[in-house]
Amino acid sequence: MSVRLPLGQISSSKLNVLSQENKLHQGKRSVRPQLNTPSNSPSTESFNNSEISLASVLNTQTSSSQFYSTPPQALHDVKERINNELTEKNSKLTDENILRLRSRVQLAYYKYRTKQVHLKFSEIVSRKKQSANKIRKPENDRKSRKLAGLNPAIEATSRTNNNNNGTSNLAVCSQQHIQCITPEKRYPAKPYASTSAISSGYTPVSVKAAKSLLQMFSTGA
């Protein structure tokens, strides 16, 4: 069996090294070595009395170290691929998309010109339809009157008669595409003189009776 030796006889032990340093320099204070710092990086205490700056040493270390970066050829390929994708997206603009964009621009300009920016497209269309219906109503009335055979002059006379009398005094008579307007004839419900009185030669005394007789003779002729 192997006999276990004490730590003092192992030359490579760190405790043995420390014990030997303490024995050699008992009167002086020993400096503890920096065990946590890596071997390739110098300690900061070594730069206190030296003229070499810490920044220069760091720069030399970073320049000597190797960084794993992508080669320039791969970057160039990636850039070309991105540019090709962008050009393909731009080339996919069809005529339909162009028409949509054009219509949007025209609608925006129309809103700005008519001061209707706050309105939606549906509201603008509904207002446009309402104004068009208001304009079409008088045109439709004129067309219906033209189809009925009414001339503008006859329309004017009918309007004046309606305004004067308060009621429609016009009666339209149609006979084989011939249409005429005749005023209403108002006969007295009860004539002031009978036919027997007229035939006997009786003359009425009142002025109203005389006027009614004149109207009867004029209408009968």
From Swiss-Prot:
InterPro entries: TF_Nrm1/Whi5. Transmembrane segments: none annotated. One of its GO terms (cellular component) is nucleus. Pfam families: Whi5 (PF08528). The keyword Zinc-finger does not apply. Its main location: cytoplasm. Residues 33-48 have a biased composition (Polar residues). It comes from the Eukaryota. Disulfide bonds: none annotated. It is found in: Cytoplasm; Nucleus. Keywords: Cytoplasm, Nucleus, Repressor, Transcription, Transcription regulation. Residues 21-48 are annotated as: Disordered. Negative regulatory component of the MBF complex involved in cell-cycle-dependent transcription. Component of the MBF complex. Belongs to the WHI5/NRM1 family. This is Transcription factor NRM1. It comes from Kluyveromyces lactis (strain ATCC 8585 / CBS 2359 / DSM 70799 / NBRC 1267 / NRRL Y-1140 / WM37). The gene is NRM1.
